[in-house]
Amino acid sequence: MRTLILLGILGATMSAPLIPQHLMSASNSNELLLNLNNAQLRPLQLQGPFNSWFPPFPGILQQQQQNQVPGLSPFSLSTREWFAGLVPNQIFVPGQVSFAQGTQAGQLDPSQPQTPQQTQRGPKNVMPSVFFKMPQEQAQMLQYYPVYMFLPWEQPQQTVAQSPPQTREQLFEKQMPFYTEFGYIPQQVEPVMPVEQQQPVFDPFLGTAPEIAAMPAEVSPYLQKEMINFQHTNAGIFIPSTSQKPSTTIFFTSAVDPIITRELTEKKAKTDSLKEP
């Protein structure tokens, strides 16, 4: 299929004229048959490659040769055909130049030396070549970057400074959530400790809470407290005493100096003995 297309393009380029011709409209199509050069009819000259295929029209050429303007040198048919093969629809007469449109016709100065026009012969010697290579500008335009991709000079530098090694307490500060400041303490998974160092577990019936030892002192010092005993004397049920004089011996025996307690008891015994009748 590609070879057929290449052969068709090759044939079209070989049959096309190599000399650019003026584009004629439909109203000026009669100028192909009738050329306004001294009111003489001219034969229809085909394009360059077809001149060797069709014989010339002898009747029109004889009439044209008889009606030549006197004073001009006769021009042979072979030379005229050769000129017609070079430039279609144009015949060069010595001392006179005619155009296919017939609008411009001027007399050349015989004193000036006439240089013969160098025109290309038919496509017999020149082989047309067809290039299918894409231009370099179009190939460069196809290279584009997507929107989400960074250009080489826009990529951020990924050099991150290594932070110094952190201790366990600093890592615990970073991992601690913000709601610990409001009193809620989540249950942290701690490593297994020996039996001697294990902390007591929270007992909901007795109301004992273990001390938080893993929390650093600078984060929340108010949370580090000693073990609090919420146990009441009657196992969680508070019953007020009905006696008028509360007994203070239970609370002061452990915290008061025993020497002071002796003096107080002696004074109390004296006052009791004085009050009795």
Curated annotation (Swiss-Prot):
Q: Which residues are glycosylated?
A: T115, T208, T248, T271
Q: Which InterPro entries match?
A: Odam
Physiological role: Tooth-associated epithelia protein that probably plays a role in odontogenesis, the complex process that results in the initiation and generation of the tooth. May be incorporated in the enamel matrix at the end of mineralization process. Involved in the induction of RHOA activity via interaction with ARHGEF and expression of downstream factors such as ROCK. Plays a role in attachment of the junctional epithelium to the tooth surface.
Q: Name one GO biological process term.
A: biomineral tissue development
Signal peptide extent:
1-15
Q: Name one GO cellular component term.
A: cell periphery
- Primary location recorded for the protein, binned into one broad class: secreted
Source organism per UniProt:
Bos taurus (Bovine)
Renumbered residue ranges of the record's region Interaction with ARHGEF5: 127-129
Which UniProt key words apply to this protein?
Biomineralization, Cytoplasm, Glycoprotein, Nucleus, Secreted, Signal
Name the family: Belongs to the ODAM family.
Subunit details: Interacts (via C-terminus) with ARHGEF5.
Modifications after synthesis and translation? O-glycosylated.
Question: Known Pfam families for this protein?
Answer: ODAM (PF15424)
Cell location = Secreted; Cytoplasm; Nucleus
What name has this protein been given in UniProt?
Odontogenic ameloblast-associated protein
Segments of this protein annotated with the region Disordered: 103-124
